[in-house]
Amino acid sequence: YRGNIMQQTAKMSGARVWLNKMKTTFSKPQNAILLALGILLTFSTIAPMISIALDTVTVHVGSVDSHYTGLNEGYTLYNWQDLFTGRLAKVNLWTPLLNSVLLSVFSCVGAIVYGGMFAYLVTRTNMRCKKYLSSIFIFPYIMPQWTLAVIWQNLFDSNLVTGTSDGLLAALFGIRMPLWWCQGMFPSVMVLSLHYAPFAYILIGGIFRNMDANLEEAATIMGTPRLKIFARVTLPLVKPAVLSTVLLVFSSAMGSYPVPHYLNLTTLCTKYVQMGEKRAGEASILAVIMILFGVLILIVNQRTTSGRQSYTTVTGKSGQISLVNLGKVGRCMVAAIFCVATFFTGILPIILFAIETFLPNPGDYSFIRNGAAGNLTTKWWMTSENITENGMYGQKGILFNEAIWGAFKGTLIVAVCCALLAGTIGLLVGYCVSKNRRSKWAAYVNNMAFLPYLMPSLAVGVAFFVFGSSMGIFNTYLLLVLAGTVKYIPFASRSALSSMMQLSGEIEEAAIIQDIPWHKRMLNIII
């Protein structure tokens, strides 16, 4: 009897100790918020993935799986069997998959070569016009992907080759580029490489700026050839930035839809849209494949960052950087080449888009050939009715078009809501993870917050499309806000985490000693 009492007492004391630990743990706001964020991010990230995984084996009424199985409801593996081994497997899966992988790989190579070379020239040489070029070089990354794709069409398309209206070169100079130049893999790779090159420049250029010049100077004093210094000293230091660029550009290019769509390249994204409702289950499998690529990239990122080498300069970093001398002619010539390149990728798109809005018809550049400004028109802007005006396809001008203004209003609503929600959640993730750096739960929350960035955008959209349909919020602003928030949380969380890592813990501890509430500490100190 006495032994039973002692066992019960031990159990009660153990439970009391556990409760006290829980109270102590969750008395800290960052721990309670971290738990809530983990549950929220798990639901918002994993639940749509589960929904789309179930959609791959669900029978869709009116789809091919329902037709060939004779079922109107339930589950079937027909979609998997038909997509991987069916008569159209090559067209629906293997060719788009190969094109997607090749597009992602070549875009990575192009972005790193172009952006990395520009970063080296700006930070480590005496090239002229550095400030101007640094500012204009990031323009393609600021602009949407489809803008460069449309500019490529407006420059190189021709009625004889592509069957569309003549582009600028064909209309003015009679130059008609071959089909492989106008459509397909090559232009898609070029456009995405130019679009993501600023991303490589930002990451790699930051390493070049902060790199200790003493390391290269020591190798120079030892008589090491400059090429060997670059290969054995410089490249290992920028390897983390290059690897980060590869992972992020690969995942972004894998999920690119507008560029392959405009430039007529069949990828997983474009094939998903083409399948539509007739092969809804097989289309969901394509989205699952893209999600698996994102998960694979996350695993590779974790493996590489966990085993990454650390280069530490014990004696401090030199502030003097020895710039490579390109020579009087070389520094001007290199600057001129990049000025021309950045003009075509950063300034010309804006000019051409502005001109296109005043052309009477697409590809009609007669005002340049004839020198007659009267051939231009403002009908695309100023037409206030859609009955007597010809060539407007039943639409009013953009300034009087209710549909355009409604879409603009909806875009602003979604953008503002996504920015506020993603910014707030990302800030809280960065704050809580920085306060629990050694916690496995914090690492899990950080990975859940970052995972949507590594997944193709279309895959995220498809997952929320299926999830929203099952939850009854399909075709609502709420679904758009949820999908946009989850997709852009990684940007906010990573930037917030980087900022929180720079804050000393003593600042908040001093406020805690003064009994300042948590919300005031966040508003007046942390933020």
Label the model's feature ranges:
Residues 125, 211-238, 265, 436-437, ...:
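Short helix-to-coil transition segments within interhelical loops
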Residues 75, 278, 376, 403, ...:
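Residue-level signal for the nucleotide or nucleotide-sugar donor/cofactor binding architecture
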Residues 7-23, 68-77, 83-86, 370-374, ...:
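Short, membrane-interfacial amphipathic segments enriched in basic
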Residues 1-36, 128, 303-341, 440-442:
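Transmembrane alpha-helical segments of polytopic membrane transport and secretion proteins
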Residues 29-65, 84-208, 237-257, 262, ...:
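Membrane-water interface segments at the C-terminal ends of transmembrane alpha-helices
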Residues 70-82, 264-274, 352, 368-386:
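Short hydrophobic, aromatic-rich alpha-helical segments embedded in or entering the lipid bilayer
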Residues 65-69, 157, 255-278, 314-317, ...:
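Glycine-rich helix-loop "coupling/hinge" segments at transmembrane-helix boundaries
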Residues 5, 13-14, 129-130, 198, ...:
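C-terminal transmembrane helix and the adjacent membrane-cytosol boundary/short C-terminal tail
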